[in-house]
């Protein structure tokens, strides 16, 4: 393979053989509503979220790991992949490997494959994300040994028990990073009567987000609009507060992990008890 693409709900990563990861950009596109002209893609488009006039639409063309807007996804991929192709040392049309969530349907898989082909690929190989994550973590997936991979992305969490080069048991759930952001927004609105945006929630999540109690309770200042007075307001939240905010999403992910373990062969579960979870 010449190029590897991780087509995520939140970010697109493009790897070029011999060069490493050359693109790591948000899966966000901004375009004019009337003309459909693309204004910005990636980081530039993400900075526009919540700040555009009515004439401009900012979208995430992938929702919960699935292509929701085929045309915009294709145009976004063309920009990223063609930029990556300029960094290649080889010539000719590239062979491209693209990752998809383990739970996608054949129709969804075909949509991704077709979109990548239209960027100019010679051939396209579609790989499930848990297998790619395991390989990236230096796990020998061909070994006759059970390894569990939990890949928490932006739109989906992919869970798989891997052995002999394949996923023996797997599940993809629509609970992941974006849900933690939404939980943060709801929690701050409910507790502090403060309305914050998606980007503010994500920054707070990265800064102090936690799913277990920390020895040192770090803090972060969140700014938004007071829902009672309608004026700008700043509050301070703690890491331990986010445990409560994230409880539902965390519980959903843990339940799915338990479910995959319960249906996996006992011998592989025994291996996982020794190897742990990647």
What are these regions (language model features)?
Residues 1-152, 160-278:
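Nucleotide/phosphate-binding catalytic cleft detector across ATP-hydrolyzing
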């Amino acid at each position: 393979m010449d190029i590897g693409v991780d087509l995520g709900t939140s970010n697109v990563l493009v790897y070029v053989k011999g060069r490493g990861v050359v693109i790591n950009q948000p899966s966000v596109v901004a375009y004019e509503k009337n003309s459909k002209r693309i204004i910005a893609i990636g980081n530039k488009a993400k900075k526009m979220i919540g700040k555009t006039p009515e004439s401009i639409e900012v979208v995430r063309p992938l929702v919960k790991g699935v292509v929701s807007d085929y045309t915009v996804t294709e145009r976004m991929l063309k920009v990223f992949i063609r930029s990556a192709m300029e960094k290649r040392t080889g010539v000719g049309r590239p062979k491209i490997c693209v990752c998809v969530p383990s739970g996608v349907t054949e129709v969804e898989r075909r949509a991704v494959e077709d979109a990548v082909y239209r960027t100019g690929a010679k051939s396209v190989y579609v790989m499930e994300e848990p297998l790619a994550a395991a390989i990236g973590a230096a796990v020998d997936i061909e070994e006759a040994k059970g390894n569990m991979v939990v890949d928490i992305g932006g739109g989906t969490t992919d869970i798989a028990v891997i052995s002999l080069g394949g996923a023996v048991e797997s599940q993809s759930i629509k609970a992941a990073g974006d849900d933690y952001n939404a939980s943060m927004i709801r929690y701050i609105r409910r507790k502090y009567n403060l309305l914050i945006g998606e980007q503010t929630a994500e920054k707070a999540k990265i800064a102090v987000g936690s799913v277990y109690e920390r020895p040192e309770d770090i803090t972060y200042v969140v700014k938004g609009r007071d829902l009672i007075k309608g004026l700008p307001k700043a509050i301070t939240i703690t890491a331990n507060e986010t445990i409560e905010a994230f409880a539902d999403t965390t519980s959903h992910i843990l339940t799915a992990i338990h479910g995959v373990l319960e249906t996996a062969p006992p011998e592989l579960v025994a291996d996982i008890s020794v190897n742990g979870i990647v």
